[in-house]
Amino acid sequence: MAREFEDHCWRDIIDDDLVEIYKSYERDLHVGERPAILAIDLYKNAYIGGDKPVIEANREHAGSCGENAWKALPPTQKLLAAARAAGVPVIYTTRHVDTRGVNSTNRDSRKLRTDAYDIVDEVKPQDGELIIYKERASAFFGTPLIAHLNRMGVRSIVALGE
């Protein structure tokens, strides 16, 4: 896996240390039968503050991925377009927010912008694409995602996003 990073569109946002760390996981990769794209947390809160260095963006806006999020947009758009053209389902995840402050974490959601967890326009879902609203970090825990994957006959997931 690590040796193949050199040829991938994300190479410019993955630093050498991370490539080295993941060398021990190297193996042949492939997309299995009946795949789906799982677009994880491409919401506005990850992009807020613009393409500043991540630490700086996150200091100003908790949860911002700064320049990493913005650099990932073009390859993400390319992958989504290719998947759609091939008829591969695209499924999005985002956080469910109760603006009254009631949620499964200790975060005070009343301080959030009301659109903080809307998917950014640059990669927004197209008509008919599924959006899974989650309360925790996992797209699977406490959500109907697995039921949707089974109903759709999906047997392989290509994950992207935050």
Model-flagged regions — what are they?
Residues 1-126:
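Active-site acidic carboxylates
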